[in-house]
Regions:
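N-terminal secretory/targeting leader peptides
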Residues: 1-200
Length: 200
């Protein structure tokens, strides 16, 4: 596989029917979460992770099956009506981000000329940056609209709470990485990248 590009195109917003202003507020909250590491992080924070498809999130929030959800970008949550029933979104989110990747087979990559590869990489970066800028602007516009209307409380965690959640996540990552040599290799690569990028 040859990677043309990958990256997060938006900052997710956490959907919630209850105010979650810091890690301690997760205690007992039923959170829709992907299985695996994400669920482990929420569990360690005191939440009760519930695994379900993203398409089931609205109905589960509406019926009280869950209280909150690791779901999508603010604009997507708004378009899907999430804020009509979950009036305490956390933005910027405190969890995973949506990732876009574009890969091609190594055999295909080897057949491309240098100019074709540059064109493909340039196209991807332009499309990716356009999408990222679009969602950043749209999310900010919608957050400003919702704050002004006063019907939704947009919660922005203070730095110390974000740092506390990050430490919980790092502990979960390290424990998972101890499970196999391959997991440790991936963990080390990610931690190295995050430190280099100033994220850790």
């Amino acid at each position: 596989v040859h990677v043309i590009g990958c990256g997060a195109y938006a900052r997710e917003s956490f959907v919630s029917k209850v105010p979650i202003r810091g890690v301690a507020d997760f205690e007992g909250v039923k959170v829709r979460s992907p299985e695996g590491l994400a669920a482990d992080v929420f569990r360690r924070a005191g939440a009760a992770p519930v695994s379900m498809a993203g398409s089931e999130t609205y109905g589960a929030l509406e019926k009280g099956v869950i209280d909150a959800a690791d779901n999508s970008a603010y604009a997507n949550n708004d378009a899907n009506g999430m804020h009509k029933i979950a009036k305490f979104p956390i933005y910027p989110g405190i969890h995973s981000t949506p990732i876009l990747q574009f890969t091609i087979g190594e055999a295909v990559a080897e057949e491309l000329s240098d100019a074709e590869m540059v064109a493909l990489e340039t196209w991807y970066l332009a499309a990716y940056n356009g999408l990222r800028q679009h969602f950043e602007r749209l999310d900010r516009q919608l957050v400003a609209r919702d704050k002004a209307a006063g019907e939704i409380e947009v919660i922005d965690w203070p730095r110390e709470e974000r740092d506390a959640m990050r430490l919980i996540a790092q502990e979960a990552w390290a424990d998972f990485a101890a499970g196999s040599d391959l997991a440790k290799e991936v963990f080390d690569a990610h931690v190295s990248f995050m430190k280099e990028a100033g994220l850790l």
